[in-house]
């Protein structure tokens, strides 16, 4: 890779590429062209005669539900899957990749959601993996370090190239993956849900790099579930459904959100949220002057039986911290919680669950599931205490029956209860977490960002579960950063900012402007 190319990517002072306005760019012709690509597996047509072009100098978004065909398309581009029909062309030249190495050598790189780095190797070794500089058959450590350091500096990353990758943050590891692609001078770079584990600062840095890559004339494919990212970053967007390309929108500037959702799921946005009004009952949970970590002022609120109460706010507003105080995962410094009019004090989450209150945490993969365990084991983690009075022996038969009952009831897409939960989609993992608490006869469900990273179709199923819970007289507290979601699903919305409650908005008055005005700092 040339120094000029790496300089343009850095986004540092003097770089004119990082902040190029979309209107000032002039994307070239198709750098990548797919025509009639078909991929079949036993009993499944994963891609059905898909045609797609990606231009030089554009960010092309790919959207669709899980199973729509996006991942299979990336595997075709990377040489993992070979199509049974159709053609792939780079710069007008037909290509057929028998391996990932062949795709890389042709100039196509994929940055997967699960990063493909070797944790025990150094940053420099990962950057140059497969093309380590050598002298007389021995790795030239000095040249290796110099090239790696140059690449990191020009990417704007100040990382010691000699440290093992396992010590880096997710955002830093992602930059190493991008660096690997640039070291091979990839002209087509595909990103698969790249912000799913990034902080706001890391996301901003990633977007700056992607804009710089676009300004250099590279073709960027951007797979995401997050509509706000499509509107912020992409030039065009293509929607997949059931293995087919449904539509390509040549401009996202005036693209109607409802139309985009309709293309993805085959139904209207009203059907996605499917709001079902209810009559609320008596107060089920009440916080009175609750104070503690993450809160700047004492917090008081009520939630009734049959209600879905939304909590909206910006990052750092204190919503997740409040949920942990309610759940017994953090100790309040003042105030208390009442359930059914009775004062309760939880010394631990276990106490909260016994009292009928449960939390589905924001970080589902780290705090909500045991990824290496089976669906059945994850579902039964809490219910096991009911199976054996002595709590010494597990009732395997009852566990299997319980797991199968909730797999069927919640339409969890899995082969069986023995399937590792890590193999399931995000939406189905969330259903397992919900099923765990349904088995515990929970009355108050604290749902912290429950649909983050979940496709639109799976969201509709989860919303339907919320409505069923509320109609059964339970209470759902929905913490969400998605304006459309919190407005579409909630009966009323409490807005937090800077560790305190800023106001409450009724369903009839809930608009994006009303919520944002309350949520913004002074």
From Swiss-Prot:
Locations listed in the record: Cell inner membrane
Entry GO terms, CC: plasma membrane
Compositionally skewed regions (Polar residues) per UniProt: 1-10
SUPFAM superfamilies in the record: P-loop containing nucleoside triphosphate hydrolases
Biased composition regions of type Low complexity, renumbered to the chain: 11-21
ABC transporter domain ranges (all copies): 32-267, 267-518
Database matches in InterPro entries: AAA+_ATPase (IPR003593), ABC_carbohydrate_import_ATPase (IPR050107), ABC_transporter-like_ATP-bd (IPR003439), ABC_transporter-like_CS (IPR017871), P-loop_NTPase (IPR027417)
Principal place of residence: membrane
Molecular function GO labels: ABC-type L-arabinose transporter activity; ATP binding; ATP hydrolysis activity
UniProt catalytic activity: L-arabinose(out) + ATP + H2O = L-arabinose(in) + ADP + phosphate + H(+)
Gene3D superfamilies registered for this protein in UniProt: P-loop containing nucleotide triphosphate hydrolases
Function noted in UniProt: Part of the ABC transporter complex AraFGH involved in arabinose import. Responsible for energy coupling to the transport system.
Quaternary structure note: The complex is composed of two ATP-binding proteins (AraG), two transmembrane proteins (AraH) and a solute-binding protein (AraF).
Protein name: Arabinose import ATP-binding protein AraG 2
Species this chain originates from: Burkholderia lata (strain ATCC 17760 / DSM 23089 / LMG 22485 / NCIMB 9086 / R18194 / 383)
Gene that encodes the chain: araG2
